[in-house]
Design a protein with these regions (language model features):
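Intrinsically disordered, low-complexity boundary segments flanking structured domains
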Residues: 15-16, 115-119, 151-153
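Residues in well-ordered beta-strands of folded domains
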Residues: 1-2, 30-32, 75-77, 131-133, ...
Length: 204
């Protein structure tokens, strides 16, 4: 299988980079130290443009998994200080706004916030949440190839990602062993869990 993708926003504005020796928060310095060269124009292996191949492959993978009954739902949980509480999720709104927020009001607030930052020539971060439904048990291998370990490695390889939480993540540190677990039960003849503490994926 082969594919080709063209990015309409990949135009390099060289004049915006020529006066910058080392770009803060980017891989410029590390690349220069490791390879003795860095491309100040952007677009190299450390560029966000590299993820276009992942987007294409991910779209195909999502379709294939759908044929197996596995459903992936990914959306922005927060944009800067604008956060959506789980009780206010409306998944029908995800594709109705450019931020993929599952809430109409939050999307409007995020648009206003980002617009203000753009006027100030600034930017912000966010939190992405991914849910997988109907995933079969037994995926992954012991120790280094556990499913959550492989997911964390793949996601952390994206340059802009600075943190990954599986399930309740760091909140588990303030929890107890008796509450931070998922007891098993039988529902309609199938083994199910009564809660979902350790398996929901958050990306920042």
């Amino acid at each position: 299988f082969s594919s080709r993708a063209e990015s309409g926003s990949a135009f390099q504005r060289l004049w915006e980079y020529c006066d910058i020796l080392i770009v803060p928060g980017h891989a410029d310095y590390c690349f220069d130290q490791k390879y003795g060269f860095r491309d100040y124009r952007g677009g190299g292996r450390s560029s966000g443009r590299e993820t276009i191949g992942r987007v294409a492959a991910g779209a195909i993978a999502s379709k294939l998994l759908g044929e197996l009954g596995i459903v992936l739902t990914t959306y922005a949980k927060s944009i800067g200080p604008v956060t959506v509480d789980e009780a206010d999720y409306d998944f029908t709104e995800i594709t109705n706004n450019s931020f993929y927020l599952p809430n109409k009001d939050a999307a409007k607030k995020a648009a206003e916030y980002v617009s203000t930052l753009m006027e100030q020539m600034d930017s912000c971060g966010g939190l992405i949440e991914c849910r997988v439904d109907h995933l079969p048990a037994g995926l992954g291998e012991p120790v280094f190839d556990k499913l959550d370990a492989l997911l964390a490695q793949a996601i952390m390889s994206i340059g802009a990602v600075k943190g990954v939480e599986i399930g309740d993540g760091f909140q588990s540190a303030s929890s107890t062993g008796s509450t931070n677990n998922d007891p098993f039960c039988m529902q309609q003849g199938q083994v199910m869990k009564t809660s979902n503490h350790p398996v929901e994926l958050w990306v920042a």
